[in-house]
């Protein structure tokens, strides 16, 4: 193991992050559930892949009615993943390999079993009365907000964010329209802000490098589309944390970069479920297993072109590219996986795109080997999302695909072992090696830095709607050209760059004149990176 420099806020942009769903990555104690020690045992794999950061999904103490996103104690780890010391050791071992770890922070709600809520729900007055949002009496609804009434001694109904088990923390209301609405600077909302600041400081002091913040844009209710009050709260909280931990990394689940970066976040996810066009690329479907109904751009059989996505993406990038990292994801625990809807060549082309675009790319565990979505029963509130959370497959020759060497029932069934790390390591042309090479290029070429300039050639789209051609340039210096054909027919692309030099190819790529790379012929589902 060689020591590598740890990414910080100022060096994030050349790296690649990897999302781990803890119960499904690696099981060290043979109980069928992934854990911190299991992740430690696989850090060398991530280091070899070129990963510079890990986003660790919710791992705090929880009754797991929503996969851990119903937190019972923010300063205690979930015992099924190990001990506090195990998590600290994970920080240490990751840092020794130059890998940062950001934890999942869920600031908008807690579990109904959290001590704060238990005290807030009591019939007698406590200091926690206003830490959650309660209506004036048990028979009063939420005035447009989801609510639960009649389950606790307190005479009121409480507002929930998602499930009944997730009471919303009170950060106030931007518009006060009900007697029980409180302003953002009321004592209850202020106490919640202070508590979140202390929670972040605590985990940073334990060795965490930052946080991915769940539903970061949804703290203040009635905040409209501008999110002015929520932005102000984050500016206050993050400035307090950074006064003590200036290198702390903050990534938001916001999906509106103009707002997220103003709020103080370093990176913001480009989310499928926002109305921003990202779903058009690889998840333009309601049937995660059926290719026939998939209208994604990277499905070579679909008619979907690049123009609609670019019309929505480029204005956002132009407004925000100097302020933060608008980040493409391969997937996550809440959305369908790329496989099996997209075949391996299409997934390879998707990664060529993702890893050459601006921002800070996030790879969901297993996507680099083609781990498929599985149609399985719901687990811990996952419902349709459960199929994207199945165990990582390490070696098909080992019990349980190497995820767990014990006999205990697995957290989720391993439905397919055909795509596994061991098999892909043996194939020089595997998806895993393809991703590894792209990550290496991204880390080595300043022109592929997350903050490097971006310029799309839109002239080809009318004739070839499933083609993308774009240039990345590092501050007026080195440039690379990327051309990709997501369609099922070959095309010819001409550049005004006779001295272009090929750096990487995906699929069938040919040059009519071998001494001149200014004209390239791209086969179906193919792409190329050229140095110019």
Predicted regions and their residues:
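C-terminal beta-strand-rich structural cap/linker in extracellular carbohydrate-active enzymes
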Residues: 514-532
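Beta-strand-rich binding/interaction modules
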Residues: 489-509
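An active-site-proximal structural segment forming one wall of the substrate-binding cleft
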Residues: 189-211
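Active-site-proximal helices and loops of the catalytic beta/alpha 8
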Residues: 92, 108-109, 114-127, 134, ...
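Loop/helix patches that line or flank the sugar-binding groove of alpha-linked glycan CAZymes
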Residues: 12-13, 242-244, 261-264, 279, ...
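Acidic/aromatic-lined carbohydrate-recognition and catalytic surfaces
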Residues: 2-191, 205, 216-263
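Short beta-strand segments
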Residues: 19-21, 55-58, 211-215, 251-253, ...
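Short, solvent-exposed loop/turn segments at secondary-structure junctions
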Residues: 23-25, 60-62, 107-108, 209, ...
């Amino acid at each position: 193991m060689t020591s590598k420099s740890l990414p910080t806020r100022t060096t994030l942009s050349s790296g690649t992050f990897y999302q781990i769903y803890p119960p499904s990555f690696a099981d060290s104690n043979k109980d069928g559930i992934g854990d911190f020690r299991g992740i430690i045992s696989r850090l060398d794999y991530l280091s070899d892949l070129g990963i510079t950061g890990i986003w660790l999904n919710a791992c705090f103490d929880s009754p797991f009615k929503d996969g851990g996103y119903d937190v019972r104690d923010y300063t205690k780890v979930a015992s099924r993943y190990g001990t506090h010391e195990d998590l600290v050791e994970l920080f240490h071992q990751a840092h020794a390999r130059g890998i940062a770890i950001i934890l999942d922070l869920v600031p908008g709600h807690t579990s109904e079993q959290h001590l704060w809520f238990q005290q807030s729900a009591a019939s007698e007055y406590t200091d926690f009365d206003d830490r959650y949002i309660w209506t004036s009496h048990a028979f009063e609804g939420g005035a447009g907000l989801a609510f639960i009434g009649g389950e606790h001694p307190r005479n009121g109904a409480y507002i929930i964010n998602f499930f009944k088990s997730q009471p919303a923390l009170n950060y106030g209301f931007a518009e006060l329209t009900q007697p029980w609405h409180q302003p953002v600077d009321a004592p209850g909302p202020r106490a919640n802000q202070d508590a979140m600041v202390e929670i972040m400081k605590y985990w940073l002091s334990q060795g965490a490098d930052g946080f991915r913040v769940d539903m970061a844009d949804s703290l203040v209710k009635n905040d409209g589309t501008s999110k002015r009050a929520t932005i102000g709260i984050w500016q206050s909280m993050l400035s307090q944390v950074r006064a003590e931990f200036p290198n702390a990394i903050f990534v938001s689940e916001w999906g509106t970069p103009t707002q997220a970066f103003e709020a103080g976040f370093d990176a913001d996810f480009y989310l499928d479920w926002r109305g921003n066009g990202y779903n058009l690329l690889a998840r333009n479907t309601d049937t995660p297993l059926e290719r026939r109904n998939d209208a994604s751009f990277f499905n070579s059989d679909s008619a979907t072109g690049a123009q609609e996505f670019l019309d929505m993406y480029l204005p956002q990038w132009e407004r925000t590219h100097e302020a933060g990292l608008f980040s493409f994801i391969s997937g996550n625990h809440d959305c369908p996986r790329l496989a099996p809807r997209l075949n391996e060549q299409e997934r390879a082309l998707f990664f060529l795109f993702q890893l050459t675009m601006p921002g800070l790319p996030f790879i969901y565990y297993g996507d680099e080997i083609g781990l498929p979505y599985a149609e399985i029963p719901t687990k811990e509130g996952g419902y349709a999302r459960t199929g994207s959370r199945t165990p990582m497959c390490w070696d098909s020759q080992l019990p349980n695909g190497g995820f767990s060497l014990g006999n205990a029932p697995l957290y989720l069934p391993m439905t397919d072992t055909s795509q596994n790390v061991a098999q892909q390591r043996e194939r020089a042309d595997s998806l895993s090696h393809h991703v590894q090479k792209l990550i290496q290029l991204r880390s080595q070429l300043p022109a592929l830095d997350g903050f490097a300039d971006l310029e799309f050639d839109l002239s080809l789209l009318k004739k070839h709607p499933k083609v993308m051609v774009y240039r990345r340039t590092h501050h007026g210096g080195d440039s690379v050209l990327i051309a990709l054909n997501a369609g099922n027919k070959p095309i010819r692309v001409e550049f005004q760059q006779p001295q272009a030099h090929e750096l990487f190819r995906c699929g069938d790529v040919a040059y009519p004149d071998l001494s001149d790379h200014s004209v390239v012929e791209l086969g179906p589902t193919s792409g190329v990176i050229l140095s110019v």
